[in-house]
Amino acid sequence: MSKSVCSKDLYCIFLKVTSKRYSALSLSEVSPIELSHDSISRWLENTHCQPKDFWSAAAPHVRETKGVIIADETILNKSRSEKIKLVRWQYSGTEHNIVRGIGMLNFLWVDEKEEICPMDLRIYEPKEDGKTKNDHFRELLRIAKRREVNPEAVIADSWYSSLDNLKMIRDLGWNWVMGLRKNRSVNKKEKLENLTIPDEGLRVHLRGYGFIHVFRFEAKNGRTNYIGTNVEDPTREKIKSLVRKRWEIEVFHRELKQTCGLEHCQSRTGRARRNHIVLSVLSWIKSADVRRNNHLSFYQQQWNVIKQAIAQQLKYELAIV
């Protein structure tokens, strides 16, 4: 039995450089120190990784740059998983259907150069903690305020545009730019979809909140999106540029899943899965730092990892021809 113990650094670097296999067995096969896959699995189940582990890396960048908070969730697909902790049936905006998976709410900092930095996350597990997605959203807002974050705006889709959320953001002294459902009541029992909204936006009274500005945007697929904001005297171009930043969190989620093994934890325990999720984000942060410091594209970074192994294999096979 191996007496060595896995570490956060080793696990994160493994997730960063591997591209196909993310299991404890795979790590044990390539680890520079002797580790059995059982010892790695036990370590993953017993260690305690928390989202605050990556706030220490994010804090300097968030506090020194101007930017916005982007909030959105992603579903870790577990359609073939049964009797595994954290997995539940829930609605997926990507699939537009109910799917089995793990719900993950992320807060992301996007600065003026559109460089992104993970700030915090929560796992949606209502049977364990009794919290809704909006409860988690407000909790993350309070934590961000305690950490002295000062965003230009908080940006999210219509799922998080409840009155309680909007009022909290306002009370924290921040602006918000949120999607609004087409049947949202404004003015005297009018629906957004029934209003004539000019390109420069329309000032309306949001029931239970107060006066806001609303903009109407047509998506390429023909869908009409309504965006509300408490920004004073907003222009269409300004709101459009802020909403466009929401795309960065979609890129972040895709990279997490495709390159950091976010969905590939094989453990059945909730603690191990939580640890794996946090460590996946930490590995993404390490990868992003390398790209930024060395001026590498995402694809250059991937190629740098595998090209040495390919070169060695070429030498080996040519030698035996």
Model-based region annotation:
Residues 30, 61-64, 147, 171-172:
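Alpha-helix C-cap/termination motif
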